[in-house]
Amino acid sequence: EAATALMMRVWPAAVARVKEEVADMQAIATTEGANITIEPWDYRFYQEKVRKAKYDLSQDEIKRYFELNNLVKGMFWSAEQLYDLKFTENTGKVPVFQPDVRTFEVSNAKTGEVTGLFYLDTYARKGKRSGAWATTYRSRAHLLGDKIVIGSNNNNFTKPAPGQPGVISLNDAETLWHEFGHAIHYYLSDVNYPSLGGSPRDFVEYPSQVNENWLMTRPVLDKFARHYETGAAMPEELVEKIEASETFNQGFATVEYLSSALVDMKLHLDPNGVVNPDAFEKKTLAEIGMPKEMVMRHRLPQFGHLFSSDAYS
């Protein structure tokens, strides 16, 4: 109940910001002659038009400098600079569960000691679960004799056509680095007893969110944010535009997450249990005043963080 109260203190300001964002989008739609009222399916399309109008910035402009292979090299480079973790590709030398998966030997950059094996499963495909996640198949626990960590990062980026570069959005780049923060965490873990590995539930996202911060630093951008055609570094003007737009669309981002979290909390606080999830979701969103122009990030039928395992619930 205390957590719910905390979120409800944030909620009104986030909803108010959504109303401002919707007004900006509606103004553009009206100016362009679109005879519409902004609905949830319009939000992402028109938010990009607003971004372009306010900051002279588009995702397409950013993507040109975010070539996937370069970004992977960049995250490995930063891990070596910060933590002495060296990632050496050995794709083709170890078994993989899908042909597109790349593999890397993980070692201590100073001593050369091999400490892990890293699987990088980058692209979306039929049958693969949605979203992005990190997994360990074996953690380090000296009591059991397990010294080599085996883990993976899994994303759902669009696979480029043969011979074409794979460029990704800023959001996807942040996701790439976020999941790699989890990987760094489990490759640095060094315990005797298995029960002491891992992390408390309220800390689990900390390493990943810290790692996101290195993406937009100048050393990383200068070395690895290179135009996919010319190889030129990302210009300072573009970096400044990205930084200026950091608070853009935060009403949407906050409301879609908070609405999911509030439905989750109220679901677990119901003393009678929930028989009809659809009716419960609609009722709860109506009670908190969910803006009609958007939807919660995780609808209950596919809210994996609630129902995918007993560890989540």
Give the predicted meaning of each segment.
Residues 94-98, 180, 200:
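A short beta-turn/loop motif at secondary-structure boundaries
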Residues 1-156, 213-262, 266, 277-280, ...:
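Active-site-proximal, well-structured secondary-structure segments within enzyme catalytic domains
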Residues 188-211, 216:
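The catalytic-center signature of Zn2+-dependent metalloproteases
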Residues 62-68, 161-169, 196-197, 246-250, ...:
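Active-site rim elements
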Residues 181-191, 217-222:
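Long, well-ordered alpha-helical segments
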Residues 79, 159, 167-187, 208:
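Active-site recognition of the HExxH zinc-binding catalytic motif
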